[in-house]
């Protein structure tokens, strides 16, 4: 695990700076008392199409609690729920989406997600088993020319806080085969991380919700820390 002495301070500054194109002029944000008191929160994407965007309900609150305790980032107690057309989308620097079913982006939603990611935002998509069939085609609407890259084991996302020499861990056994950590890049920056065939969200839920052993649950939480730490530091 990385030393917290300088990393926590750096991540705190990034998290509270809101590194996405602001909805207000910078002068207005600087003068706003609420901006100064901002705490980091993960934004759960409320997508359409019929998929259960709300699945693993205890996962994000648990991740945010551990970000505070392990990394030292002040976090909100609950997740933020945002649609891609939400006026406050650009005030949320880190988005998360998961589910078992169909994901659909309208043309306007796809364009807005693209602008969000091009402006410094980050999306972590975690397939709960069943999302993949629609998610990747929908992301083609967002970045038509981008190709998914299976991130190599030496990528920094696997070593920035906790060390994963074998890449993303397999947490929940929905079907056989290895776990994959896939990325979409824009101008050399990783803007979308897609955890596929692993279900990190199952492993970060409350104890007893899923039949995952303690070591798998710990690996899931450590991987979640890495994804957020990486996103906030790049």
Task: Describe each region flagged by the PLM.
Residues 50, 132-208, 214-225:
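An acidic, glycine-rich "communication" segment
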Residues 77-84, 106-112, 176-180:
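Alpha-helical scaffolding within the catalytic cores
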Residues 8-23:
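Bacterial N-terminal signal peptides
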Residues 1-6:
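Positively charged n-region of N-terminal signal peptides that target proteins for export
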Residues 73-83, 125-128, 146-154:
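Surface-exposed patches in mature extracellular/periplasmic domains of secreted proteins
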Residues 42, 94-133:
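Short alpha-beta junction capping motif
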Residues 24-94, 100-101, 191, 199-234:
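Aromatic-Pro/Gly-enriched surface loop or interdomain linker
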Residues 57-64, 110, 114, 132, ...:
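Extracytoplasmic/secreted envelope proteins and their assembly/folding machinery
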């Amino acid at each position: 695990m990385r030393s917290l002495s300088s990393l926590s301070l750096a991540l705190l500054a990034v998290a509270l700076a809101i590194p996405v194109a602001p909805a207000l002029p910078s002068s207005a944000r600087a003068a706003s008392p609420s901006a100064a008191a901002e705490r980091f929160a993960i934004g759960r994407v409320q997508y359409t199409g019929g998929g259960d965007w709300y699945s693993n309900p205890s996962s994000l609150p648990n991740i945010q609690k551990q970000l505070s305790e392990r990394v030292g980032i002040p976090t909100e107690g609950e997740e933020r729920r945002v649609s891609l057309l939400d006026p406050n989308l650009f005030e949320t620097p880190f988005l998360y989406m998961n589910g078992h079913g169909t994901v659909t982006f309208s043309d306007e939603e796809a364009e807005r997600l693209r602008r969000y990611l091009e402006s410094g935002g980050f999306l972590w998509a975690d397939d709960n088993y069943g999302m993949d069939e629609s998610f990747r085609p929908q992301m083609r609407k967002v970045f038509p020319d981008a190709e998914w890259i299976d991130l190599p084991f030496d990528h920094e996302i696997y070593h920035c806080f906790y060390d994963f020499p074998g890449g993303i861990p397999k947490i929940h056994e929905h079907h056989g085969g290895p776990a994959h950590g896939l990325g979409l890049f824009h101008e050399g920056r990783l803007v979308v991380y897609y955890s596929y065939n692993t279900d990190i969200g199952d492993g970060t839920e409350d104890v007893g919700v899923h039949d995952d052993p303690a070591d798998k649950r710990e690996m899931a939480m450590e991987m979640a820390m890495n994804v957020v730490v990486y996103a906030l530091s790049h």
